[in-house]
UniProtKB/Swiss-Prot annotation:
Principal localisation: membrane
Chain positions carrying an annotated carbohydrate: 5, 29
Name listed for the protein in its UniProt record: Putative neuropeptide Y receptor 11
Role description: Could be a receptor for neuropeptide Y and peptide YY.
GO terms for cellular component: plasma membrane
Organism of derivation: Caenorhabditis elegans
Pfam families the record matches: 7tm_1
Keywords: Cell membrane, Disulfide bond, G-protein coupled receptor, Glycoprotein, Membrane, Receptor, Transducer, Transmembrane, Transmembrane helix
Lineage: Eukaryota, Metazoa, Ecdysozoa, Nematoda, Chromadorea
């Protein structure tokens, strides 16, 4: 009996020694491990992503849900993005962090399958939501007076991104499974690895290579193309509008200060559009390239260190999206300040948004209370369309529609 217990203790000791990926011993039984310091670094990075990403997306969700005026078709896509990014931060990031830090899976087979597919679903939904926001903004410019058409297209976009996300997540649900590494019934010890099994992929209708390429196209290439196309067209419309305004300013007022204001606003708006595209492209490219190299065995072995860096960079997108689509949005900033005031965090509001933004918020609230916002309801169709487009572009200039 003593020898059995001693053997079990040895098994547990070996298990504890090889389970953690980041350690001082670089190679154990042919398995390469990463330095312990890198384990601390990657854990800290994931914790920051989880914390700030969850808070930023949660605030965005709360603002839209609690304020009826914010429940517009355009903000509906931002809400959808915030929901998907929130679950990326509280589900995908922690689960991946655990699989990066530890070799063996301590949970059930069902949780292994759910974790694999849910991680993919959240990522697909997040990136498709980003593309839908860009396309929705583009449609808003092309059909400024066709509100019913805009709503129908937006509804179609919403249904489409959920359906495609679910379809792309199904193969991950099938392929993810447990692989037994060590089973010792006498010690009640069983070690399993949760991963996508090549044997299951070979039995499926779609191969792993085909699936990886399909994900590269649908999750990265197509959304990136949508962002570049939509925002380049929007930027072109804005450029024409800025040129006309600058010409009018020069002709009528000849005021260099106002010209500089027009140029600065154009530069700031274009910079924001470029940032939207750049953040998506830079954040998701390394992870997609890694999956291509790993799937087609262009590298000798799977590197946990390389994967964790690529995945951590992709997760940064979930943190930056609330900044790009909400905190840089004028209407959202106003509502965030209202929210901070409502929960008694006025000092924090001033720290985050500054005195100038707080003053603008007070002036806007007073302006609304006096009935300063009016809507033009009668005009010739062509004139009304130009006015609508002009108002939309003006809103975008103030970062209200991105």
């Amino acid at each position: 009996m003593g020898s059995v217990n001693e053997s079990c203790d040895n098994y547990v000791e070996i298990f504890n020694k090889i389970n953690y990926f980041f350690r001082d011993d670089q190679v154990i039984n042919g398995t390469e491990y990463s330095p312990k310091e890198f384990g601390y670094f990657i854990t800290f990075a994931y914790m920051l992503i989880i914390l700030f990403g969850a808070i930023g997306n949660f605030l965005t969700i709360i603002v839209v849900i609690l304020n009826p005026a914010m429940r517009t078709t355009r903000n509906f896509f931002i809400l959808n993005l915030a929901l998907s990014d929130f679950f990326v931060c509280i589900v995908t990031a922690p689960t991946t962090l655990y699989t990066v830090l530890y070799m063996f899976w301590p949970f059930s087979r069902t949780l292994c399958k759910i974790a694999g597919s849910l991680q993919g679903f959240n990522i697909f939904l997040s990136t498709f939501s980003i593309a839908s926001i860009a396309v929705d903004r583009y449609v808003l410019i092309i059909f400024p007076t066709k509100r019913e058409r805009q709503q129908n297209l937006s509804f179609c976009f919403f249904i489409m991104i959920w359906v495609i996300s679910l379809i792309l997540a199904v193969p991950l649900l099938q392929a993810s499974d447990l692989t037994p590494v060590f089973v010792e019934p006498s010690c009640d010890l069983a070690l399993y690895i949760c991963h996508e099994q090549n044997e299951i992929w070979e039995k499926m209708i779609i191969s792993k290579g085909t699936y990886t390429l399909a994900v590269l196209i649908t999750q990265y290439a197509f959304p990136l193309f949508s962002l570049v196309f939509a925002y380049s067209r929007i930027a072109h419309r804005m450029k024409l509008r800025f040129a006309n305004r600058n010409q009018n300013v020069t002709t009528n007022t000849n005021t260099s200060q106002r010209r500089r204001s027009v140029v600065e606003r154009q530069r700031r708006t274009h910079l924001l559009l470029v940032c939207v595209v750049a953040v998506f492209a830079v954040a998701w490219l390394p992870l997609n390239v890694f999956h291509i190299f790993n799937t087609f065995e262009l590298v000798n072995s799977f590197s946990v260190t390389t994967f964790s860096i690529c995945h951590c960079l992709a997760m940064c997108s979930a943190c930056l999206n609330p900044l790009i689509y909400a905190f840089f949005n004028h209407n959202f900033r106003i509502e965030f300040m209202h929210l901070f005031d409502r929960v008694g965090l006025r000092s924090l509001r001033v720290v985050i948004f500054g005195e100038q933004e707080s003053l603008k918020k007070s002036m806007r609230t007073e302006f609304r209370s006096r009935g300063g916002c009016k809507t033009v309801t009668t005009a010739e169709p062509a004139t009304f369309q130009r006015m609508n487009e002009s108002m939309i572009l003006s809103a975008m200039e103030q970062d209200e529609q991105l």
